[in-house]
Amino acid sequence: MTIQRMDHVSVVVDDLEAAIAFFVELGMEREGAAQIEGPWVDRINGLDGVRVDITMLRTPDGHGRLELTKFHHPTAVSAEPKNALGNTLGLRSIMFAVDDVDATIAGLRAHGADLVGEVA
C-alpha cells in the first residue's frame, strides 16, 4: 500500500469568513461548503454533539486543498501558548509559491496579516 496523493489539510478557525477571505486573497478558490454533524463526525473528532461549518478551498493548479473548519459545538479551544515557538510540537506551517511576493503581502495586509520578520 502506498499513498496516492495528499488529499487536504484541515485547519480549525474561529472566524470562518475572515479565513476564507485570507486564503481567497492568496488565490485559492472555493470548492464547496457544508454544515456537518452526526455520529460519524463525533466519532472522527472524538467529541460528542459535533456541529461544524466547513469550507473547502483548492489551489489554482487543483493539486492542493485546504479545509477550513468552524466549530459551533462544542466550541473550539485555543492551543497554548498562542504564539508558540518554532520548535513547538504540531502543525508548523503551510507554504505556498506566489508570483509576486510584494503584491501578495499587500493584499494579505488588507485582511489583517502582518510579517513576523523580513522576507528572505
State each model region's role.
Residues 12-63, 103, 110:
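Core segments of cupin and vicinal oxygen chelate
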Residues 5-14, 53-72, 79-108:
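Vicinal oxygen chelate
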Residues 1-2:
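Basic/polar N-terminal segments that are highly enriched at the extreme N-terminus
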Residues 38-42, 76-81, 118-120:
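A cross-kingdom feature marking solvent-exposed beta-strand/loop segments within repeated
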Residues 26-28, 75-78:
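Short hydrophobic/aromatic-rich motifs at helix boundaries and adjacent loops
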Residues 31-34, 116-120:
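Conserved S-adenosyl-L-methionine
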Residues 35-36, 71-73:
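Histidine- and/or cysteine-centered catalytic micro-motif in compact active-site loops
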